[in-house]
């Protein structure tokens, strides 16, 4: 029996995205996690913040946080990581394993 692992995913969305596109982006990435075996516990916008330094030409971004549990054998985290790297609407992302 594989133990479920808890993860916190934080990603920064470009600030000039319209609300409808942002909602679609968040839903798309939540669905990617669910379809690959993860359970999304919480998915919420944190706030629009100024960045410490310019990234991809932006000085601020919309921070979004997702709390997830996923079996270690599921590819949900790897698939999220792969797709977030190639998405132009996501400036940066970080995946952290939460210790129990």
Curated annotation (Swiss-Prot):
Superkingdom of the source species: Bacteria
Signal peptide residues on this chain, from the entry's feature table: none
Gene Ontology MF: a single term: structural constituent of ribosome
One of the GO BP terms on file: translation
Keyword tags: Ribonucleoprotein, Ribosomal protein, RNA-binding, rRNA-binding
InterPro entries: Ribosomal_bS6 (IPR000529), Ribosomal_bS6_sf (IPR035980), Ribosomal_S6_plastid/chlpt (IPR020814), Transl_elong_EF1B/ribsomal_bS6 (IPR014717)
GO cellular component: cytoplasm; ribonucleoprotein complex; ribosome
Entries under Pfam families matching the protein: Ribosomal_S6
Protein task: Binds together with bS18 to 16S ribosomal RNA.
Family of this protein: Belongs to the bacterial ribosomal protein bS6 family.
PANTHER family found in the cross-reference section: MITOCHONDRIAL 28S RIBOSOMAL PROTEIN S6 (PTHR21011), SMALL RIBOSOMAL SUBUNIT PROTEIN BS6M (PTHR21011:SF1)
Name of the featured protein: Small ribosomal subunit protein bS6
Gene name of this polypeptide: rpsF
